[in-house]
Amino acid sequence: MKDNIVTIDGPSASGKGTLARNIAKYLGFEILDSGLLYRVYAYLYDCGIEHAQITETINQDITFKSDESGIVVLKEKNNITDELRKESTAKAASKISALLETRENLMLLQRGFYSPKGLVADGRDMGTVVFPNACLLYTSPSPRDS
């Protein structure tokens, strides 16, 4: 596996997150949920933080922790995971992800999740754009399409 990175690309609600957690647990790798990272970005933008400061804010004030139920997100030690899972945050993330500035800012952050012990990254363009040298898995929402 090149660079010890496994990426799982696919559309929303195709099982990427569950597959990524299971593979990461099995291999002992770190995990990156890029959709959650986009939600954090949208959440911070909605809190009034400008694009130019969001990456720095994420690096300084946001902590990602894995547990049995998935990834927990802390902002200055306050759990904001439930806020990030709200439909309104998902819609905001979808809108903001269409902006080139957002995608460019997040690409460096996403690449920063790499760990020498390995990484499983899930998202719509993880293997095609963010980690092009990774082992790529593609999921489909329909078992027939896989």
Write out the residue ranges for each language-model feature.
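P-loop (Walker A) phosphate-binding loop of NTP-binding proteins
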Residues: P11
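Hydrophobic anchor at the beta1->P-loop junction of P-loop NTPases
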Residues: I8
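Walker A/P-loop
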Residues: G17
